[in-house]
Amino acid sequence: MEPRQKKARFFDSEEDFGPDTKSLIRPGSSHKPGKPASNSLARPTPAPSTFRSDLEAFLGPLSDQRFGLLLAKSKGNVEQAVNIHFDLPEEVQQATSEETAEEAEVSQTTTSGFETTQKPSQNTQVPSRVHTRGGCSTSRFIGSLVVTAWASKSSKGKVKYQDRLVVERQSHDHSKSIRKNPTDNSHVHIRTVSGELLGRISGEHDYSIASLIDSRVCDFEASCVYADHNLSLGSNFVVELKCYLTEEAFQDVAMPLLDSKTAKKREYVFDNSRESHVEKMLRNRQIAIVDLFGKLNLIKENEANADMVKDMLRAKSQPPSSQPPSQNSEDESEPIPTDELDALYKRIEKEDVEQPETEVEGFPLELRRYQKQGLTWMISRETEVSEYFDNDDSGPINPLWTKVDFPGSDEKFYVNFSSGALTLKFPKQERSFSGGILADEMGLGKTISTLAMVYRDRHVGCTLVVAPMSLLWQWEQECERVGLSTYVYHEKGADIDLDELFKTYSPNILITSYHTLVSHYGQIKALGGGLDRNVISETSSHERPKIFTKHFHRIVLDEAHVIKNRNTVSAKACCLLRATNKWALTGTPIHNRLEDLFSILKFLGAAPWNDFIYWRNFITLPFQEGKIVSALMTVQCILEPIVLRRTKNMKQADGSPLVVLPKKTINIEKVALTDQERVIYSYVLARAQTSLQKSEASEAVGRNYLNILTQILRLRQSCCDPALILRPEAEVPTDEQLQIEENESQLKSMIQQYNDDTQTSACEYSSEIIAQLQDQSAPPECPICAEDVTKLAISKCLHMGCVDCLADNVRFQESKKQTPVCCICRQPAALKDIFEVERTGEDCKDIRLKKLSDRPRSSKLVALVSKLKQLPKDAKSVVFSQFTSYLDIIQTELRREKIQAFRFDGTLSRQQRTDVLKAFGLSKGSVLLISLKTGGVGLNLVTANHAFIMDPWWTFAQEAQAIDRIHRMGQTKDVHVTRFIVENSVEEKMLKIQQQKMVLAGTLGMSEQEQKAQRIENIKTLLGE
């Protein structure tokens, strides 16, 4: 048989289009045998409304069957479609003759590219059916699509027009595959009703359809629109999909994603991993619903949020393989520009000028006016909360939800395109939780305000207070002051059975720590199948920690920013707690990242913002895309109704200050390094500069970033005390968890020489001078202070005086960059050459010369001791440092100077912390040594009015938090703060960075690449000359 002669083409084409599979593969595509061809076209696809009209302008009216064939062959290209029409007249006529009356139903659809949206007649009943997967339930028809499928094998006469087909996903546990492989298998197979595999849906549609099937949102019925009689591998055929919403689609958005056995046994509580399999499936569901509803044209133009949904359609997320979510929680969102964060806090501040005042009858403490107004607001936040969903649709609809009509019916349902949730009930705009965030600035009495609220309804139920371990004693003490009964559920106190406790003793307030919750949460691993599941086994409820099963009247998280990282066990544990009312107390609900707020909202149950899908779509993603103002405005809208924030600088209605506090003075004390200290500092600086230069030369600054930060850490330590450089620091600041290399013999030698420089023994002094000291019946007069010597010392030049006078003379000259000399004979002098004279034995005739110091005092330590000695004898001081090893050195020196010092840091137990704070409060003229990290959390230290900051933090906000532990409500004296800064050092440059509101760990409000570049510039600034 001779081959058919092709007719002259209506259009010229670079290709011949025949029935072979080559004609269906885009030129230049990376198609391989057994692989589906790409669905994208070599030429732009005409607009959906013009393709059919343009085609019929050349060929005349076309039936849907003929149009389907040309659409599949030409892939939407008019020129190719016309040429195919004339090249294959026999096939076209055969396809036309096979058209049946049932085509009328298909012809009622309107074509949109490769998709059609069915519009059933208003007089016809909406298609519905019963599906059996997952149990019997009714599915509701919402529209139909025409999609292109790819033949996965060759076949002959297996499928023809209007044959019913089966849509099938691979039978495997999708939740497990998500956990194992971040790239999901999104293939959707098409089979005949007899089960024979024909192919799979093309890549343009398979991801969304697969997600909808996996999440049990939709069922699909398929039928053939067009297929070649002889299907070859890689060829296309056209399928119509009828879409049905399942009953499960309207259930809790989280529960259907668990397998049926797990769903019956487990209670979904808190999903707080970086992105768990549940969060991933929810995100996939949301993307697929947005995609499907867009294709079905179910979004009306007059809906209030139609523009938002269309934006989501235009920029809908890519499949996870192309845009995987961040696996680092800290990078989930970029840092907030400092100016924007300050402005956000300013906008949510409440003046309360119109807020009425609430008195608490019998409350023993006097509340200030702003506290009474705040109490009114807090009480209003604990009023009864109505159900989030209500059948009464007379009120305003929640702005995040959109009303959608079932096709051909007066019935409707509601969809939240930001989360993928569906409901048949009217979503009213209602308050979703009871409680809020009390975010008053530090020192305005958040604790007293909370206790007043508890006291008001103390007989209603128990309030659980969760606080850092260092504040447990403070809460217990404050409760006792106002007459509230307490029980401290911590350490040994946490071993008690809560049910038994409340049978015999019902405290007004149960006080526990975040540490205790973390400890109890660890028990869930054995009971609930693992912490990564974020679920608790109901079958083991009798063994579950009782603090997670008891329903409290109220829960208060003090210093709630402790749970700012949603991946921490502290955050997860707090979100398991159950209560009618929930409160978060924190002066900084947002520290420097928007993600800081998410965990607090999750704890509060602030729907819908406690759902990570909402948070990601409305806040995280816009912020990462540079829409900073828009994202922060959304955060402002979230916070305004649930946050009460006042600051010390605010005014009351009559213009008077909100709170009157004593004056606070902050001074910067410049400290000069000694020559030996400068040598060590210069050596460390040179090493850091060399490291930076080598990294720049090899373009590896980013890879060596931590190593360079290590060098900067050494510089900071050498400013405090050179001995710190080689000490393993147990409590290095959180942004500097860096290891210090110790195999540098030259640096070790320099520091050893600094510590042990030229030991002088008493035997160098002549026996004549010792004898002269033994014969003295009374102490000599000091040549420096001209008073009787109470603590005798002798120098190498054999001149005597007060030990402090001789030592201070040397230190003063060193601070002025002068060579120290004796004030009497002008011979060279040094601290190592001064010995304290100790008399022992009968008549104090036995003389012992004691070296002034076992090691030299650093310049900062000298400056601190000098300042402390200048204070009145009964003055109390607090000394802050980031380095606990430095606090060890300071403590040793203060003891040597007979200055009473107490130590407060993270190494102390709760009882030890309580004892330290009590002793410091009762003492006079004492010093409290405290780590900056511990001192920045909740402590009330108003018994002291002098503060010394030994080393600067990267941001002054951290130092300000520590200072406000002294300068707060209850302080009656002026507060004096001294910040010690070494001249011509990295510390001075850190002050400049503070003033520019920049942070080394990441410059704010820039793209990732800009942040990296700015970090490098900051390093250059710190290490520059």
From Swiss-Prot:
Compositionally biased intervals (Polar residues): 37-49, 113-127
Annotated motif DEAH box, positions: 558-561
SUPFAM superfamilies from the UniProt entry: P-loop containing nucleoside triphosphate hydrolases, RING/U-box
One of the record's GO cellular component terms: nucleus
Described purpose of this protein according to its UniProt entry: Probable helicase, member of the UBC2/RAD6 epistasis group. Functions with DNA repair protein RAD18 in error-free postreplication DNA repair. Involved in the maintenance of wild-type rates of instability of simple repetitive sequences such as poly(GT) repeats. Seems to be involved in maintaining a balance which acts in favor of error-prone non-homologous joining during DNA double-strand breaks repairs.
CDD domains in the cross-refs: DEXDc_SHPRH-like, SF2_C_SNF
SMART domains linked: DEXDc, HELICc, HIRAN
Coiled-coil zones: none
Entry EC number(s): 3.6.4.-
Subcellular locations according to the entry: Cytoplasm; Nucleus
Region of interest called Disordered, as start-end residue ranges on this chain: 1-49, 93-133, 314-336
Any one of the GO BP annotations: DNA repair
Keyword list, A-Z: ATP-binding, Cytoplasm, DNA damage, DNA repair, DNA-binding, Helicase, Hydrolase, Metal-binding, Nucleotide-binding, Nucleus, Zinc, Zinc-finger
Domain Helicase C-terminal: 860-1012
Protein name according to UniProt: DNA repair protein RAD5
Zn finger intervals (RING-type): 782-826
PANTHER family assigned: DNA REPAIR PROTEIN RAD5, TRANSCRIPTION TERMINATION FACTOR 2-RELATED
Sites where the protein binds ATP: D440, E441, M442, G443, L444, G445, K446, T447
Main localization, broad class: cytoplasm
Pfam families on file: Helicase_C, HIRAN, SNF2-rel_dom
Keyword Transcription regulation on entry: no
Organism field: Yarrowia lipolytica (strain CLIB 122 / E 150) (Yeast)
